[in-house]
A protein has these predicted regions:
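Charged, low-complexity interaction regions
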Residues: 123, 143, 171-180
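Long, contiguous interaction/recruitment modules in multidomain scaffold/adaptor proteins
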Residues: 63-111
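Active-site-proximal loop/hinge segments that shape catalytic or ion-binding/gating pockets
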Residues: 91-154
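Contiguous, structured surface segment used for ligand recognition
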Residues: 56-58
């Protein structure tokens, strides 16, 4: 029986994706190899009572991967090994979890590719605000501003500003935002949000 965070077992043969970091190592020194089986440190726990304890690797579908660009600089296709089950979680953001994955077909993310992912995305409104901020932090300024133009208005700008501030605070706490270009890109977005608020 599946726990409260899991909706169903998913089809292993569907197309899945994961954003990975290749320019620098993760904080734990890990690097993800390509075209070989990678095993999660913690197995999927179907009875987890806390989302952070679900285990496995989080992966997503193409229409939701825009939400996860903050995770790295490269988009990979994900194959699920024959002996591994994959589970769809109870989430509005298309999150799937598996114990083992194979990362293939890496593609570097830049502003143009981020824009493509945005145009093919189907996210809840609040997730667009998070993704917009993530794009700004990653230096995908054109994409961030396009999301802002398309998704932010006088009625929801306060929510967008709160999401940006909360997102950036978490990143600052994690010592993530230390790049002058990222700081400038976030400022451009923040100033635009304040302009919308003053309309």
């Amino acid at each position: 029986m599946l726990g409260k965070f899991f909706e169903c077992e998913a089809n292993r043969n569907e197309k899945y994706y994961r954003v990975i970091q290749t320019i620098k190592e993760y904080s734990d020194g890990r690097r993800f190899p390509l075209n070989e089986i990678v095993v999660a440190d913690n197995k999927v726990d179907l009875n987890a009572t806390d989302r952070t304890k679900m285990g496995g690797f989080c992966i997503s579908s193409y229409e939701y991967i825009f939400r996860w660009l903050i995770r790295g600089d490269t988009l990979c296709e994900v194959k699920i090994p024959e002996d591994t089950k994959i589970y769809k979680t109870v989430s509005d953001n298309g999150i799937y979890i598996a114990d083992k994955i194979i990362l293939t077909n890496p593609k570097k993310i830049d502003d143009d590719f981020a824009m493509e992912l945005y145009r093919k995305s189907t996210l809840p409104e609040i997730s667009y605000f998070k993704a917009m901020t993530a794009c700004s932090i990653c230096g995908y300024t054109n994409t961030a501003m396009k999301v802002c133009t398309d998704k932010v208005n006088k009625e929801n700008v306060d929510i967008a500003i709160t999401e940006l501030e909360d997102f950036c605070k978490r990143r600052n706490d994690e010592k993530y935002i230390n790049d002058p270009l990222a700081i400038e890109s976030v400022k451009i977005l923040y100033d635009r949000l304040k302009e919308i608020k003053e309309l």
